[in-house]
Amino acid sequence: MLRTSIATSRQLLSSPVCPKASAQWLRSSNAGRANTTTRRYYAIQQEPNGALRSSLSPSAAAVSDVSQRASNSTNTKRPNTSDLNVRSPASPSTGSTLKPETVLVAPVSPLRQGQSSPGSAAPAPEPAAAPPPSPPPPPPAPKTGRLRKFLLYLFLTTGLAYAGGVWYSLRSDNFYDFFTEYAPYGENAVIYLEERDFRNRFPNATKKNNRRAVAPRDEGAQVTIPGGSGLSWKVAEEQQEGSDISKKGPHMSAVDNNKATKDTKTVEKTKGGVTSKSPAQKEEAVMTKPAPEGVKTQPAKVAETPREPAIPAITTIDHLVLNTEDEPVVQDLVKVFNDIITVISADAPSSFSGPVAKAKEELEKIGKRILALKSDAQASAQKEINDAHASFDKSAANLIRHIDEMRAEDATKFREEFEAERERIAQSYQEKINTELQRAHEVAEQRLRNELVEQAIELNRKFLSDVKNLVEHERESRLSKLAELVSSVAELERLTAGWSDVIDINLKTQQLQVAVDAVRTTLENSNVPRPFIRELAAVKELASNDEVVSAAIDSISPVAYQRGIPSSAHLVDRFRRVATEVRKASLLPENAGITSHAASFVLNKVMLKKHGSPAGNDVESTLTRAENFLEEGNLDEAAREMNSLKGWAKLLSKDWLADVRRVLEVKQALEVIETEARLRCLQVE
């Protein structure tokens, strides 16, 4: 089917027919600028009978011939077969291997559209075969939405981490402190979950099931005084100040202040009417004596001016006084009642004196009843307290008795343990004393025995001396010759024994010298480093009692006699290779980089090698002197020269110096052993 929009149809009508057969479908270059929502593409479908059926939208315009290309009519018309050959694009042949759905629209260039004049009516020849279609454009890259995914994953990860932190905070106190301190709203979340868990576990905990219902307190109707009462603005203002019975004043106390108000209080300022008794008015009030009926009347006297009062004196009602200082509820009730009396006294005391007196009696009865109830409660409480004290005393006595019994048992147990321990210690000390006495007795007996033996020897010596003297006196000539003979024989025996020791020492010295020569021969005749553990073990066995030889052998490094030491020729050959590498790094500083290495390598090629015995501390002079010492066989001086190097030169010659040190240590130890052997020979002589 062929579907096209109005914009595409108008562009086809305004453009000439392309003379070439390569463009199968015509498309304006401006079609890309149209809205993508109204763009439609070709879709060709071949019916079984081979006829091509075109279906146009109701808003599309059909073209019947070439002369009607410039019309802008929007009427729809079904084209006939001849019109299809003129205006419709060439349909693909039935033998084509390409499917119509896979063929894309090829845009028409503006230059090719303008080549044919608008008035040209020559029909385009139908191509014999359809050209191969152009390759499809690459599909647009799909939107990855990395930022959206990143934000989504970040939000989910943060939420999971936060929920995990809240959950773990309910199980770990240390993590709870960390989480509530650093996590935002962490403490509120944890507290909310704890409260919710508590409500789930104890649903009736917040209900007031165990509390006693308190009856509402009947305070009566609230008494108010009109604000506009009085004759002048000044008195009305004072009345407004005194109308608030909740402020501090004489009416707030039902005991102390009412005792002082037994005398009659008259109104000081009659122009403003009757006001409540405030502390400022107490100073200006004039006190009068009480009347016998309980109602106190006194004509008012103005303190400020000496003129007569404009209003006649009024009577007042005495306040209620109850001796219940330690009952706050009764005090509050009396205070409220006295406030009412104050208000009534200010308005019409004579009309309410009867009910007020009756109320006073009722309140006094209530006060007495409260005092009686209080005394009964105090008596019952005191009784309970006494009973509790008695039970506590009894329990304390039982506890003290139990503690005394336990203490006595512990004391008996400790005493038995103490006696057993004391007996054990006494027995052990007795055994020690017996042992010491026995040893002292044995020592004394041995001392006495030794003294007896010494005395016997001394007596025997004296006896022999006496006998000798007697015999010499008798036989002076023969005995004297015998004594000389005995002394000569003893001297010969002594010399014989001494020479046997000398022979043994010489034999050991010779064996030691032979073992040292064997070690030296092994080291000098080996071309490669060779271990000399057996030779060194023989030397150590021959001089096992000599501390100097043992110290010399211990000074040799285990690596030296386990792996062997290089020969002098090997050291010289290795020195030459090491000297070449040291000369390459002779110009490098300690913290050299790649540039310094390259510069040192280049400059080393142009440097001249020194000969003889040059003076100086540079690397080349040191290497020359060390090489001369090696040629002379002086390893010690060569090692000293190489040890004076610094930086990279010393680092490169570190292994060679270690080998030279091991060789010097072995040679020095062998020299010490040989010297010790010679000293032995000299001591014998």
UniProtKB/Swiss-Prot annotation:
InterPro entries: MIC60 (IPR019133). Keywords: Coiled coil, Membrane, Mitochondrion, Mitochondrion inner membrane, Transit peptide, Transmembrane, Transmembrane helix. Residues 20-149 are mitochondrial matrix. It comes from the Eukaryota. The chain crosses the membrane at residues 150-169. Residues 51-67 have a biased composition (Low complexity). One of its GO terms (cellular component) is MICOS complex. Residues 68-99 have a biased composition (Polar residues). It is found in: Mitochondrion inner membrane. Pfam families: Mitofilin (PF09731). Residues 170-685 are mitochondrial intermembrane. Residues 49-144, 209-305 are annotated as: Disordered. It is a single-pass membrane protein. Residues 356-456 form a coiled coil. Residues 124-142 have a biased composition (Pro residues). Residues 1-19 form a transit peptide. PANTHER family: MICOS COMPLEX SUBUNIT MIC60, MITOFILIN. Component of the mitochondrial contact site and cristae organizing system (MICOS) complex. This is MICOS complex subunit MIC60.
